[in-house]
Design a protein with these regions (language model features):
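Helicase motor core with emphasis on the C-terminal RecA-like subdomain
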Residues: 2-12, 16-20, 24-46, 52-57, ...
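C-terminal accessory region of SF2 helicases/translocases
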Residues: 278, 295-296, 304-313, 319-598
Length: 598
């Protein structure tokens, strides 16, 4: 079997051998053991499930929250002749059904699934008929409430295990503290503890913390001093645009990226940066997951992340090609105050959460004992003006209410329109009195999408506009008029956040926030922030050693390239110089060192 793994690696990827602990993980999961693999960014995680998936009978199901990564990996696997597909929110019901049926009948070897899809009745019904070899859980730290990126949807993975008893799980993550490592194995119901850990040390990456009152000037100075592709991380969407404009004014090509942009715009900017058409990407933490660009020379954090896990993962996007790269954190005295304030912003007092829940019911005129299943568009700005709240507090309260089971809050809708024909294909051809724009849009829809007669289907209005030789606005009005004539069902794309009540409304004072949702998570959040502050202020210990220790990895050697190590080296040279002066071995005249002769 071991030789089979290597022959698969060579046949499909062209690599002569495995790296690091890849083979250990592959052999472990292939033998049927639940396995947790800890590998740093760029460590080759995907190989550890793709190779054994091809070596075994059945289908490997890969659970990941990263839709961009899904699409990218499926594309690359298909280019290698490997049967792969994915299920995610952008796909229509009929497309998902087709993918699942293909999987059942052998047309798919590796199936990527977003965690939100696991709970759907359709997926669970079809899953019973799929021969599963093993289940891979990517970004496994998301299942841990002690992790920095907990996602409630990940808890459903344990339910899938009950449907497929005896099927082993491979959990993978690039960021997990010892506490999170234990929690992952417990939450995924590992039959026994089984962890393989690759060193998180990045020998080609120099970690630098630089104290700077004027961070923008320091950022420009650094980018002018060190060439190559770069990512600038900031906390707010507004600042991404400001930083990109500032850099452009300085002659440094830059663009910006955040979760609020249209999908087409995000895709366009990401591709421009990946192709080096622009040098710098200014972004929030919405950018970077699943992005394959190995030659990033520098990651600069203008704003301090709220955990070392987040910092390590974002900084780790530099230098994935093994070449010398830099991770720079710009820090000053104001950052500590901002980080401390984030605790209060992220965990408002329970009384305030209850008040916001109550006012939400007034806002939508929902009576006690009603509302379950209802969805409402949510204008947070209007809500805050009426009830005199800060948006950050409202946003945090809604997330806590979501984790407590009262509602579902989506602040970043997908922004794509959906269409379904209400007439049969033959009836469409008999239609008369269609305007030229309506006729062009109907023709473009029929050419581009095969599922429009059976289900609501996501459409690309820009593509339809190109095919119909119309503007996007003309396409929109044509779709609206077709819907008014009951020819199609049309759900316009919406960027407005929405709220769905997952249970009937109760009195605000009866809202119960569980301890694990508020007290326990707040305590862990405070600990992570304190660790981040300590890292930024600790200028006596090697940066790499500090990071490795946080993730439970002991390392006696220093990196010799971070700001602390370089400062210590200068101190050592100065001490040596002073000693020689004291011992009368050298003299200093006009700042020149002159060695004394015997």
């Amino acid at each position: 079997m071991a030789d089979k793994f290597q022959s698969i690696l060579q046949k499909y990827w062209g690599y002569p051998d495995f790296r690091g602990i890849q083979r250990n993980i592959i052999e472990s999961i292939a033998s049927g053991r639940d396995t947790l693999g800890l590998m740093p960014t760029g460590g080759g995680k995907s190989i550890t499930f793709q190779v054994p998936a091809l070596a075994q009978e059945g289908v490997c199901i890969v659970i990941t929250p990263l839709i961009a990564l899904m699409k990218d990996q499926v594309l690359h696997l298909k280019e290698r002749g490997i049967l792969a597909d994915a299920i995610y929110a952008d796909k229509s019901r009929s497309e998902i059904l087709q993918t699942l049926d293909n999987t059942i009948f052998g047309g798919v070897k590796i199936l990527y699934v977003s965690p939100e899809r696991l709970a759907s009745e359709m997926f669970q019904t079809k899953l019973r008929h799929i021969h599963v070899s093993f289940i891979t859980v990517d970004e496994a730290h998301c299942i841990s409430q002690w992790g920095y990126d907990f996602r409630p949807s990940y808890l459903q993975i344990a339910d899938i295990r009950e449907m497929k008893p005896g099927v082993p799980i491979l959990a993978l993550t690039a960021t997990a503290t010892p506490e999170v490592v234990e929690d992952i194995q417990e939450k995924l119901h590992f039959s026994e503890k089984n962890v393989f850990k690759m060193s998180f040390e990045r020998k080609n990456l120099a970690y630098v913390v630089r104290e700077a009152e004027d961070k923008q000037s320091e950022m420009i100075h650094i980018l002018q001093s060190v060439g190559g592709s770069a990512i600038i991380y900031v906390r707010s969407r507004k600042r991404t645009k400001e930083m990109a404009q500032l850099l452009s004014q300085q002659g440094i090509t830059a663009t910006f990226y955040h979760a609020g942009l249209d999908p087409d715009v995000k895709d366009q900017r990401q591709k421009a940066w990946q192709k080096d058409e622009v040098r710098v990407m200014c972004a929030t933490n919405a950018f970077g997951m699943g992005i394959d660009k190995p030659d990033v020379r520098m990651v600069i954090h203008i704003d301090c992340p709220d955990s070392l896990e987040a910092y390590f993962q974002e900084a780790g996007r530099a230098g994935r090609d093994g070449q010398k790269s830099y991770a720079v954190l710009l820090y000053n005295k104001h950052d500590e105050l901002k980080l401390s304030k984030r605790v209060e912003d992220t965990f408002p007092q329970k009384e305030l959460i209850q008040d916001i829940y109550e006012h939400l019911a007034y806002f939508y005129q929902i009576g006690v004992g009603s509302g379950q299943g209802k969805t409402f568009e949510f204008d947070i700005e209007k809500f805050c003006i009426i009830y005199k709240y800060f948006p950050t507090k409202v946003d945090a309260a809604l997330r806590i209410l979501e984790r407590s089971g009262y509602l579902y809050y989506e602040d970043n809708p997908d922004g794509k329109a959906r269409v379904m024909f209400l007439l049969g294909r033959n009836d469409l051809y008999l239609l008369d009195q269609l305007s030229p724009s309506q006729d062009a849009v109907v023709t473009a829809l029929l050419r581009s999408y095969g599922s429009l007669f059976v289900d609501l289907t996501y459409i690309d209005e820009a593509m339809i506009a190109r095919q119909a030789e119309l503007t996007i606005q003309q396409v929109y009005f044509a779709l609206k008029s077709l819907a008014a004539r009951h020819i199609i069902k049309f759900i316009p794309r919406r960027k407005i956040p929405f709220i769905t009540y997952t249970r009937d409304r109760v009195d605000g004072n009866k809202v119960v926030i569980p301890k694990e949702v508020w007290e326990s998570r707040r305590e862990q959040y405070e600990k992570r922030i304190k660790s981040m502050i300590h890292y930024a202020k600790n200028d006596e210990e090697c940066r790499s050693k500090q990071l490795l220790a946080y993730f439970g990895e002991e390392n006696d050697s220093e990196c010799k390239q971070c700001d602390v190590c370089l400062a210590n080296r200068e101190d050592d040279k100065e001490k040596e110089l002073r000693m020689k002066v004291a011992e009368n071995q050298i003299i200093i005249e006009d700042h020149h060192i002159i060695e004394k002769k015997d």
